[in-house]
Amino acid sequence: MGKPKGIRAARKLKTHRQAQRWNDKGYKKAHLGTRWKANPFGTASHAKGIVLEKVGVEAKQPNSAIRKCVRVQLIKNGKKITAFVPNDGCLNFIEENDEVLVAGFGRKGHAVGDIPGVRFKIVKVANTSLIALFKGKKERPRS
């Protein structure tokens, strides 16, 4: 069969190309807008939330570790997410019912490294940078 050729074939070629474009994974991702619908943050880069509980997530094979994470309920829409707590001992700065600032974790909405299903990380606790607490530059505010 092949494609139509000739002087009046442009419309047919154009509409066929438009229809076939939707089979391209990258095109579909860019044009459907599901990136914003599926993302708990909506269109934002960061979101505030309340810590529900501390959880340990087992690392994927071949690693053997328990990665320290927290379950967070976002204030803006009530969605519950799991967020990674970076650096050694930083879980000690976080308590239940704390307000935390959560950011993405790298790979554009995908899990990172050996931590399955965790797409976010903690940036601030009680309006204080987690790194500043970790380095000892700031102390946790007393509530």
UniProtKB/Swiss-Prot annotation:
Domain of life: Eukaryota
Stretch forming the signal peptide: none
Keyword annotations from UniProtKB, A to Z: Cytoplasm, Endoplasmic reticulum, Hydroxylation, Ribonucleoprotein, Ribosomal protein
An annotated GO BP: cytoplasmic translation
Chief site of localization: cytoplasm
UniProt modified residues of type Hydroxyproline: 62
Family indicated by similarity: Belongs to the universal ribosomal protein uS12 family.
Record note on quaternary structure: Component of the 40S small ribosomal subunit.
The protein's name in its UniProt record: Small ribosomal subunit protein uS12
Gene: rps-23
